[in-house]
Every structure is written in C-alpha cells, then in structure tokens.
C-alpha cells in the first residue's frame, strides 16, 4: 500500500515538475497507472488529447529504457527537443543521423544517459540496434501512430510489423503500449491482435472535438471561395490542404497575388525550402500555409483557427486528423471541406496509381487497395449526407453520442425540408434489376433521366422500361437519392473503381411501400454565427499582455531554434495573463510551467509581465 501511495506521489511530482501540469487530462492517468502496473496498453486519443504524456511520464518512472517507435523524422526531432527542454534526456535514431552519431546515441543510452529513445521502424532490424536492445534494460516499447501496423488502417506500413519480431527477440518481455489518434473498431482490434498485447488496458477517450465547426461546401469556383474566406479571416492562422502539388502551387500563387502572407509545403520542394516555409508558418511570419497532406504530422501550432480542404481527402481518418490541427488551444475553429465530384475521380486515380511498395505481398497490396476504395466511399458519403457531420464521423469511429443536433456543423445549423423520395428510389431499384446490376450511379442516373447519349444507347438502356421516367429531375437530385439509399443500406456499391450498384435485402421494401425513403433537402441556410475568437477570459489589457508574451516567445524560440510551443503553449501564456505571476512560486502555478521550463525561461516572462504592469501604472 505504501508503495502505491509513493508511486502516486512520484507520478504527480513528475507531472508538475517536468511537464508543468497540476492534473491529468481525460484518460491519461488511467493509462499511466496501468503501464506502471506492468500492463499492456492501447490508447485511442484524438489529436491534441495529450497522448505523449501517457508514455513519456511512466518512462521516467520505470527502471529501464523506453523505446518509442515513430514513423516520422520531424515528429521524433520535435518530441526529443520538447523533452530536452523539459530537462529529460532523450534521443532519436533515424536516417537524419550519421552512423557515428547513431553509435554514440546508442552507447549513451546503454550507459543510462537516456530514458527515452525514439526510433524509426526501418531501424529495428539493423545489427547495431539489435545489439543494443538485446543488451539494454528495456522497460517499455511504445508504438506511436499504431494504426500503421494494421492492414485496415489508412496508412499501413509493413515496416511496423518488425516491431512484433523485436518484442519476441527480447530476453525479457517489456510493457507494450500503442497509441493512435484515429482508429475504427477493426483497426483497434487489429492493433491488439498483431502486436500480441497481453490482456491490454484499452482506453478510447472519445473522438469529439466540440470546439470544431464542420462544414461541407460545393462552390462553383473553389479559388474564389478560398480567397474570400481567407480575406475575411485576415487575422487568423490557417491551413489549406490540397490533394496535389499542382493545386498547392496554384492556390498559393493566387493567395500571394492577392496580398495574403502565405507559404506552401509539398514533397516537390527541396528540404531547405520545406523547412524554411514550415518555420515561417510556425513563427506566424506567414500565418497561412497551403499544403499537401505531407504537412502537419507532429506540428503542434495551437492557434490554427481554420483548416480548409480544397479537395476531398481519401478517407475520414485523414480528414479528421488534418481538420484536427485546428483549434488545439480549445478555442472555436472551423473545418471546411470544399467538395466537387472531380475530387472523387482524383482520389480514385491516386489510389489506382499508388507507387509500388516492394514491402507488400500481392495479397497485402490487394487488401490495401480494397480498403482504400471502401474508405473513399465513406468519405464521399460524408460530403453528401444531410445528417449531422460530427455524428457521421463519430459513428465511423464507433462512437455514438445519441444527439440529432450537435449545434456546430453546417447541417445542424441549416433549415431542411423533408421530402419523401420513395417513388424515385423505386425507379432506381427497378432500373438496377433490369440491367442485372451491371452499372454504376452515372449510367443509372442517365437512364432514368432519359439522356440522349451515344454511350448510354450503346449499353441498350434506352430500351429499358424505366428510361426517361425521371426526366424532369436534375442529375444532382437523383445522385442525392442514390447516395441516401447507399447510406441507409437500400443499395451497396462494389469495392472497386467502377462502383457498380447492387441491391440489398432491404431494396424491395421501398418498392412494396413497406418502408419509405425520406430525404432532407436544403431550403435555406442560417448564417453561421462566428464567435470572436480570443483567448478565454482575457479583457483588452489581457490581450495586450498576451501579444507581448507571444512576441517574447517567438524571439526565444528563434534564438533556441525550437518551435514556439516548446517554450510555452498558448494555454500557458493565457494562464499567465490571467494569474499575473510575480514570483517563482506563482509562476510554477501557471498551467504548463514546470521547474525546468521556469529555470530556462520563467524569469524573462516574469520580467515582461512586470514591465507591462508598470506601463499600465504610468498610463493608468
């Protein structure tokens, strides 16, 4: 009993002194406690929920070394910088280091100088690393971005399977912990199974980010839509994601031409330019960045007020993770997806023309392809549903709030008219029957609209009994009905690029009138009431102090060559503005300020606060 009390005190002490927090966030303490008890853990926690503390804190209390497997070099470097700034000795092993640097880092770890070692999965089976782990005292192996180990995941990497062999090779099995931000039930089960987690403690903290507003728009001109949005949010920092480098360059040039302080990021730029552009964004020199999805992993910029998607992403997992880079400070932020049917075609092309991965077997390649197509289908449904957008995504991840109206998405803030479209749905079903389930949405839509196209005539659909039965209806309306039928399970699509429409067991219930298909149709949109987004609880003077502290943070970050959030987070700056600390003890009561952070930076921030208050007195 005394040992448990002592561990609890030590745990709280590390949380306070190293990480600067008085209390754990949702799910963190349970995960930490189970790891310290020697139990395997699987944590599913959304972006910004504090996953890293869940393994970094127990790593400092366990007797040996913790190995953290991470897929991205930039992510490792930032994590190690943040730990070093907090007074924790950590290292990383990846291709950014020379062989001599790797040898030195592993030697130092073996000598007990590092408690945490980050490693790229490709390094796990190198002779040097194997020699190290077989002779070192390994207390825990942590797998970050654990969805990469699952064939059901959106980013399956065969190199992650090397982790399984590594665990088996160790003379003593360590605690194994796995973390990811986005995982469906199938992916979660696969993570547990493939890693061979022993009776794991599984914690899903919930995917909902209530401060994020979600919206899907289908503009006639995406460029004009983006420009108007950015111009009306000039004071805000934002990310604009595009599916291709070509679109990144086009949108970037358009915004720059119109006087926006904007930068860009994609794999076609050289390393130096990517690094410089990323720093311009992080330091708010250029608060807007246009990027492919190569950008953002591990970027902890808390004041991003909006994420626009110029193109629809390939899957809900990617969309939720990318959109989740907005509002990490807990303040209101907007996530807006600009959809066009062309986005589906672009993504199908990208899926069909993925570069060959020699690590994949033929069976794995087919499984990944089929899963990609299935996920793309779910993403497309998101863009057409009239139901709550937040609830749609939560349901996708296996979470159900039971709410019909979240009050913070475009569908829930819209006024809809309900229409019974059972008759149209019945015509669709009869047409699919008549063609013996051989065609997809475009052909079925063209058939019942009676379109006079040579391609349709070549299929012989002009002889169908249903040809032209919905001639008066628009193409978009019929496609909307078909999407609704797919969503409600009255139809299904094949999992390939042709997306052939197939009937289900419930299809005939619409023809018989046993069930009805009710579709929401947008009548008019209410203007979304945008809140003035300023740090919580700050008055005009508090905002002036916040800006002074923010500028001080940027200067320090540049001098130290670290991202600003590593110095202090926006939340910490806001807390300083509220509490106005004057002494070390008072500064240590600020959320996010630990002993090591205080010793490095605290005095400069205390001085800045004092100068601000003295100016207040003079002008008072």
Feature names for model-found ranges:
Residues 2-11, 345-346, 357-362, 371-373, ...:
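Accessory DNA-binding and partner-docking regions appended to nucleic-acid-acting proteins
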Residues 5-18, 22-26, 30-52, 60-62, ...:
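Helicase motor core with emphasis on the C-terminal RecA-like subdomain
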Residues 35, 230, 281, 383, ...:
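Short helix-to-turn junction characteristic of helix-turn-helix DNA-binding domains
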Residues 172, 234, 386, 437, ...:
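Flexible coil/turn residues that form the inter-helical turn or adjacent wing/linker of helix-turn-helix
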Residues 367-397:
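Short, charged low-complexity linear segments at domain edges
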């Amino acid at each position: 009993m005394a040992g448990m009390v002592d561990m609890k005190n030590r745990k709280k002490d590390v949380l306070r002194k190293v990480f600067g927090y008085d209390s754990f966030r949702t799910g963190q303490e349970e995960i930490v406690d189970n790891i310290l008890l020697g139990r395997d853990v699987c944590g599913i926690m959304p972006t910004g929920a504090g996953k890293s503390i869940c393994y970094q804190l127990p790593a400092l209390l366990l007797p040996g070394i913790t190995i953290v497997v991470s897929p991205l070099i930039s992510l490792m470097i930032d994590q190690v910088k943040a730990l070093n700034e907090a007074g924790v000795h950590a290292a990383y092993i990846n291709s950014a280091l020379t062989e001599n640097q790797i040898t030195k880092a592993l030697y130092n770890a073996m000598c007990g100088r590092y408690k945490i070692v980050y490693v790229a999965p490709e390094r796990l089976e190198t002779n040097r690393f194997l020699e190290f782990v077989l002779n070192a005292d390994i207390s825990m192996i942590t797998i970050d971005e654990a969805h990469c180990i699952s064939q059901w995941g959106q980013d399956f990497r065969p190199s992650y399977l090397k982790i399984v062999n590594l665990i088996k090779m160790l003379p003593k099995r360590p605690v194994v912990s796995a973390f990811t931000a986005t995982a469906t039930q199938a992916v979660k089960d696969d993570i547990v199974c493939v890693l061979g987690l022993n009776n794991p403690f599984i914690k899903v903290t919930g995917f909902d980010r209530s401060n994020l507003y979600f919206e899907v728009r289908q503009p006639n001109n995406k460029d004009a839509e983006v420009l108007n949005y950015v111009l009306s949010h000039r004071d805000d920092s934002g990310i604009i994601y595009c599916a291709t480098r070509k679109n990144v360059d086009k949108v970037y040039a358009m915004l720059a031409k119109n006087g926006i302080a904007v930068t860009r990021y994609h794999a076609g730029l050289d390393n130096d330019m990517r690094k410089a552009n990323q720093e311009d964004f992080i330091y708010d020199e250029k608060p807007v960045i246009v990027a492919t999805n190569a950008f953002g992993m591990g970027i902890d910029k808390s004041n991003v007020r909006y994420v626009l998607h110029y193109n629809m992403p390939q899957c809900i997992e990617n969309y939720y993770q990318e959109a989740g880079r907005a509002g990490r400070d807990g303040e209101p932020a907007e996530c807006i997806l600009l959809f066009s049917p062309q986005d589906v075609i672009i993504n199908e092309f990208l899926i069909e023309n993925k570069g060959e991965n020699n690590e994949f077997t033929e069976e794995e390649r087919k499984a990944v392809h089929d899963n990609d197509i299935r996920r793309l289908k779910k993403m497309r449904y998101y863009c057409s549903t009239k139901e709550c957008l937040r609830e749609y995504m939560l349901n996708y991840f296996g979470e159900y709030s039971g709410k019909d109206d979240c009050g913070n998405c475009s569908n829930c803030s819209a006024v809809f008219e309900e229409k019974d479209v059972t008759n149209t749905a019945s015509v669709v079903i009869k047409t699919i029957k008549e063609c013996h389930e051989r065609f997809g949405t475009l052909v079925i839509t063209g058939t019942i609209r009676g379109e006079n196209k040579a391609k349709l005539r070549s299929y012989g659909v002009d002889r169908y009994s249903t040809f032209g039965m919905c001639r008066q209806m628009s193409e978009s309306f019929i496609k909307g009905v078909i999407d609704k039928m797919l969503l409600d399970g009255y139809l299904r699509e094949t999992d390939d690029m042709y997306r052939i429409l197939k009937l289900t067991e419930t299809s005939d219930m619409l023809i018989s009138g046993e069930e009805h298909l009710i579709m929401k149709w947008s009548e008019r949109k209410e203007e979304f009431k945008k809140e003035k987004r300023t740090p919580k609880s700050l008055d005009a003077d508090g905002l002036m102090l916040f800006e002074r502290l923010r500028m001080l943070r940027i200067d320090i970050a540049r001098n130290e060559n670290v991202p600003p959030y590593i110095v202090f987070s926006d939340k910490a700056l806001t807390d300083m503005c509220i509490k106005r600390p004057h002494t070390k003890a008072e500064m240590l009561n600020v959320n996010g300020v630990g002993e090591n952070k205080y010793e490095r930076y605290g005095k400069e921030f205390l001085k800045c606060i004092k100068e601000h208050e003295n100016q207040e007195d003079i002008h008072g």
